[in-house]
Amino acid sequence: MGRLHSKGKGISSSALPYRRTAPSWLKISSQDVDETICKFAKKGLTPSQIGVILRDSHGIAQVKSVTGSKILRILKAHGLAPEIPEDLYHLIKKAVSIRKHLERFRKDKDSKFRLILVESRIHRLARYYKKTKKLPPVWKYESTTASTLVA
């Protein structure tokens, strides 16, 4: 499947391990992993940042193989999940930074065009998240209030 607003095909991906069980050399329990995830979430890290830290410094390649549930589900169980999904949050952040750039450089036509593309992606994702009930049905992206969502 190709990218939405570019020519890229997106064929690169990491290979998942064949076995879906925790490795035998991993001596950490699922409760310890839960506590670690909650500790990082309280520091303000996103679920993907938590996964990178667990992979790089704790040796946990897949949280689901150790605990039986994914990082976001663990965060939801403890009430620490972000109110806006992470990919939508980063798109809003990108749109805010492009708008800030356009305030300084009003004639930057390419940035205006890219802002239109980013905002159309935001609307498309928001429609999907409303349909799957991850966002409230009255949630709406507005460029004027977007900086408060990101800050």
From Swiss-Prot:
Keywords: Ribonucleoprotein, Ribosomal protein
Keyword hit for Ribonucleoprotein: yes
GO cellular component, one term: nucleolus
CDD domains the record matches: Ribosomal_S15p_S13e (cd00353)
Biological process terms in GO annotation: translation
Superkingdom of the organism of origin: Eukaryota
Gene it is expressed from: RPS13
GO MF term list: small ribosomal subunit rRNA binding; structural constituent of ribosome
Gene3D superfamilies per the UniProt record, alphabetical: 4.10.860.130, S15/NS1, RNA-binding (1.10.287.10)
Keyword Cytoplasm: no
Recorded family membership: Belongs to the universal ribosomal protein uS15 family.
Species: Pisum sativum (Garden pea)
Protein name (record): Small ribosomal subunit protein uS15
